[in-house]
C-alpha cells in the first residue's frame, strides 16, 4: 500500500478509524471524511503519529445532506486527481423516522445515497489511478428484506432496524451495478459485512431502541476485528481482479437472493440518480 491514496468516510471512529490506521501503517496516504471536527482532528493526529511522513488530510461534511455530499466529493476530486481506494463506510441507524433538508429519509440518505454521490464525484480520480478499488461497508442486516420501490423513503411504515437493513441491501445492489458498469475499466467494486461491532453504531438511534443496541454490544466483536475485511479488500492482491462481490471475514460470502437481483440493482441505480439529482455514464 506504500504510496497509495485511500479516501475513507466514517473515519473518525469505529471500524473506519481502525481501517485508516491499519492502512496508514502499511504506507498508504489517507484522506479522511468526517462530520465531527473534534473526533476528526483526533483521528488525523493519530494517523500522523503512525505515519508522520505521509501528508494525511481530512475533509468535513454532513453526508446526509446532498449539498454536503457533492461539496466534499468536489473538494477531494480537486485535491486528489488520482485515488487508489475509496472506502464508503456509513452505518447510521435511527429509531425514529427523520427527513433531511432535501426531503430524504435520513437512514437511506446517509447509508446509501452518500455512497452513490461520493463514488460519482470521485470516479474520474479512481479511473485515473486504475487499477483502483471501491469498497462499501454493507451488513448481514440485509437478510430477510427486500426493497419497496414504491416506498424507498420508508414513509408508509418505519421501523429502525429493517430500514437500516434495507439501506445495507441497497449497498450490495449498488456494488453489483457499479461493478457491471465499470467492467473493463480497471476499477473494481466490492462490499462487505464487518460483523456486529462494538462501536458508536446505534448510539444516536434514540429512545428505547438506543438502549437495546447498547445492551447488545456485550456480544459484539472489537473494531479491530471488524475492520479486517475492509483492510483486506483495500490491500490484498487476492482480490485485485475481483469485482461485484460480497465479503465476510476476508472471504467471499453469498448475500440473499434479493441482493443478487440484477434488475433491482439497475432500478435502484436509476431511482437513486433521480433522488440525488446526478447521473453516471
Give a label for each model feature.
Residues 39, 207-208, 218, 264:
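Short acidic-hydrophobic sequence patches enriched in Asp/Glu that either
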Residues 9, 156, 160, 212-216, ...:
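A short, mixed-charge helix-start or loop-turn motif at secondary-structure junctions
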Residues 20-24, 210, 251-255:
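A short small-residue
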Residues 1-200, 275-281:
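Rossmann-fold NAD(P)H-dependent dehydrogenase/reductase core
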Residues 198-214:
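A glycine/serine/threonine-rich, flexible loop-to-helix segment
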Residues 147-152, 204-207, 246-247:
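Short, flexible, mixed-charge acidic loops at enzyme active sites
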Residues 203, 258-259:
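Short glycine/threonine-rich loop-to-helix capping motif typified by GTGT followed
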Residues 167, 191, 214-254, 260-266, ...:
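C-terminal helical subdomain
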Amino acid at each position: 500500500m506504500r504510496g497509495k491514496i485511500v479516501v475513507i468516510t466514517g473515519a473518525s471512529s469505529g471500524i473506519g478509524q481502525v481501517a485508516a490506521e491499519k492502512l496508514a501503517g502499511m504506507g498508504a496516504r489517507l484522506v479522511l471524511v468526517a462530520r465531527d471536527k473534534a473526533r476528526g482532528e483526533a483521528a488525523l493526529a493519530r494517523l500522523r503519529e503512525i505515519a508522520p511522513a505521509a501528508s494525511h488530510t481530512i475533509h468535513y461534511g454532513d453526508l446526509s445532506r446532498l449539498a454536503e455530499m457533492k461539496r466534499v466529493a468536489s473538494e477531494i476530486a480537486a485535491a486528489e486527481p488520482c485515488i487508489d481506494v475509496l472506502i464508503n463506510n456509513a452505518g447510521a441507524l435511527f429509531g425514529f423516522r427523520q427527513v433531511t433538508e432535501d426531503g430524504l429519509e435520513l437512514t437511506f440518505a446517509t447509508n446509501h445515497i452518500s455512497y452513490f454521490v461520493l463514488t460519482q464525484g470521485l470516479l474520474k480520480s479512481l479511473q485515473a489511478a486504475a487499477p483502483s478499488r471501491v469498497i462499501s461497508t454493507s451488513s448481514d442486516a440485509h437478510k430477510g428484506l427486500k426493497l419497496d420501490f414504491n416506498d424507498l423513503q420508508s414513509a408508509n411504515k418505519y421501523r429502525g432496524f429493517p430500514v437500516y437493513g434495507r439501506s445495507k441491501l441497497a449497498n450490495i445492489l449498488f456494488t453489483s451495478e457499479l461493478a457491471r458498469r465499470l467492467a473493463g475499466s480497471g476499477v473494481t467494486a466490492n462490499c462487505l459485512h464487518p460483523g456486529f461491532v462494538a462501536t458508536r453504531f446505534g448510539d444516536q438511534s434514540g429512545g428505547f431502541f438506543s438502549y437495546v443496541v447498547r445492551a447488545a454490544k456485550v456480544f459484539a466483536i472489537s473494531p479491530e476485528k471488524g475492520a479486517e475485511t475492509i483492510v483486506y479488500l483495500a490491500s490484498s492482491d487476492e482480490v485485485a481482479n475481483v469485482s461485484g462481490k460480497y465479503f465476510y471475514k476476508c472471504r467471499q460470502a453469498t448475500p440473499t437472493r434479493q441482493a443478487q437481483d440484477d434488475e433491482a440493482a439497475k432500478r435502484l441505480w436509476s431511482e437513486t440518480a433521480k433522488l440525488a439529482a446526478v447521473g453516471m455514464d
